[in-house]
């Protein structure tokens, strides 16, 4: 997913096929985190990787055009790609229908999986080790074969970044590898015996916070990666992105935060309990200010992503005598209480789309409701009617996908390239999502640009909600709000300042799919940013009489 880092013109790329995933080793059974087959040695560096030249292995894929007989279908393994096509130049409707029929046949071979699915996003300041930690998880859970890992090691050495071997698994484009900074939201999958996971590796640099918001908007759990190294922790907290990421995660609606105190094996730290306590004490104060409840919302885990320590397997005896808690993956496996609105209206914000052989595929997280193969749905806001051909996860398929699943959906019925845009949502035909350009909202002001310190009517910035990004202008201020009692204090104020909460009317540059907070919180939360900082966050409380009447009319129809 290519994203423009400039907030003023930030637009996800919706036309290119996604990059081919790294070859993955077939995984028959994934061990429990506490009994994983990979046991990290108590050393700050991973075991050396064999780099002698051998034939490179690649993941097996199956071309739709190669499926001719029932035997071809039977030979498809669950870990193979669902389908692969060579071009997207098909214009003939009959040929598109033929491809769609073959896709339907292929996905019938794949198993359904009843394990809970969690979307996790890696957050934190630049160079905290987010991509390295993500990559080490992929290796430890068997998603990267040795030949591919050896290839990444060679490439890291060629770029004089020997310590970035695991990061190369997630940072796939040349800019990320040469600069050593994540730009896009990396995406990968792994599993344990308890759960299935989608990894969203977000950028840490302040220029790419809009990209981070796209990743965090899909997540159930945030993993805030903290460098324990002397100077790096302080840089991330004092003027860095550590606290902003934690604040944004709370605003966007992430339920849990797991704080991974990374680089504990670093020579300036050496598993120091005093350093760990210093970090956790300071962060707890900041996280509470961001709205996180220390008793139930966040957990601390010490470890090392590069050293693969306390990531999958718990710490081996002798590594750290003061920590006996679960590993990072063990902590994730133990999380419970995810709220899933299965009975609600279908809502799937589209994060990516691409076209194969005339079939449009979209990727997104099911926020509410359910979606089934064969179902007719709308792409909003344009009300394009499409049919669902298939629903697939990384190694499983679904007849019906439920809230929390991050899936690829093959669709039939799209004509033209303007049906899908940033902010598009899949919705039920008889339960449409509101499309509005003016809203009433409660806004909490966090910061203001240096050149304009007051929040007043006519103030303009950038509006982020789910995958939508639009210009926004303050139309009017209705009343200031007491945040403790939620009561209105002053009617029609002329201005507001940092720290205030205000009920106001906002006008968007283009109509966006939004809902009221009482109906669907995930489609009601938003943030307001300028080019480099988060100005405010808020929630939609009223979509307006006209929008409500239109929804009522469409529902009856």
Curated annotation (Swiss-Prot):
Major subcellular site: cytoplasm
Residues with site note (Interacts with GTP/GDP): 273, 407
Role: Involved in translation termination. Stimulates the activity of erf1. Binds guanine nucleotides.
Annotated GTP binding sites: 124-131, 201-205, 262-265
Annotated spans, Disordered: 40-71
Originating organism: Dictyostelium discoideum
The protein's name in its UniProt record: Eukaryotic peptide chain release factor GTP-binding subunit
Family note: Belongs to the TRAFAC class translation factor GTPase superfamily. Classic translation factor GTPase family. ERF3 subfamily.
UniProt keyword terms in alphabetical order: Cytoplasm, GTP-binding, Nucleotide-binding
Listed Pfam families: GTP-eEF1A_C, GTP_EFTU, GTP_EFTU_D2
Keyword Nucleotide-binding applies: yes
G3: annotated segments: 201-204
Entry superkingdom: Eukaryota
Gene that encodes the chain: erf3
InterPro entries the UniProt entry points to: EFTu-like_2, G_TR_CS, GTP-eEF1A_C, P-loop_NTPase, T_Tr_GTP-bd_dom, TRAFAC_GTPase_members, Transl_B-barrel_sf, Transl_elong_EF1A/Init_IF2_C
Chain positions covered by the region annotation G5: 304-306
BP GO terms, sorted: cellular response to stress; translation
